[in-house]
Amino acid sequence: MSKTPSYEDATACQAALFEWAESYDLKDWNRLSKCIAPTLQIDYRAVFGQFWEAMPADEFVGMISSPGFLGNPLIKTQHFVGMTRWTQTSEDSVTGRHQMRVAHQKYADAQMKEVVLKGHGHGGATTWFRKVDGDWKFAGIEPEIRWAEFDLDKIFAE
């Protein structure tokens, strides 16, 4: 099965995608935990060379919210999602293909006045969604960085 999902299913997946992006940018880990599937496929090979075929939700939230990643209070992000193409791959699975721009800034201290690093990724992402107990949940991501501005590779380096 490979078809365009119904309007209702596509907008429900879009809502889950919005919650995912907003939770990252607002560092709202409780919000993140509510919009994700119990297990996720995380293909971060383009980001830091790692792939997880079936990462449990609590491990995913722990990784994302860690001080070495988005949990660093000195790092601000905006995960901007552009145009999307949706494909329904089964009754309870939808794949999204998105244009993406992800901006990152790292600040010198908690006053958030002096930017010490900038790094912005441009490209796309494939995302997966799974229907869980009647609700569409974010179930994974594979970013594709086509090009970067500034020092994206240094944002999460210690």
From Swiss-Prot:
UniProt key word Amino-acid biosynthesis = no
Specify which residues bind substrate according to the UniProt entry for this protein. Y24, Y44
Protein's recorded name: Scytalone dehydratase-like protein CPUR_05428
Q: What Gene Ontology terms for biological process does this UniProt record contain?
A: melanin metabolic process
Q: What is its EC number?
A: 4.2.1.-
Claim: Methyltransferase is one of the keywords in the record: no
Q: Where is the active site?
A: H79, H104
The protein's annotated pathway: Pigment biosynthesis
The organism's superkingdom is given as Eukaryota
Q: Which family does it belong to?
A: Belongs to the scytalone dehydratase family.
MF terms per GO, please? scytalone dehydratase activity
Q: What does this protein do?
A: Scytalone dehydratase-like protein; part of the ergochrome gene cluster responsible for the typical purple-black color of the ergot sclerotia. The ergochrome gene cluster produces several ergot pigments including the yellow ergochrome secalonic acid and its derivatives, as well as the red anthraquinones endocrocin and clavorubin. The pathway begins with the synthesis of atrochrysone thioester by the polyketide synthase (PKS) CPUR_05437. The atrochrysone carboxyl ACP thioesterase CPUR_05436 then breaks the thioester bond and releases the atrochrysone carboxylic acid from CPUR_05437.
Query: What EC class does the entry list?
Result: lyase
Write out the entry's keywords from A to Z.
Lyase
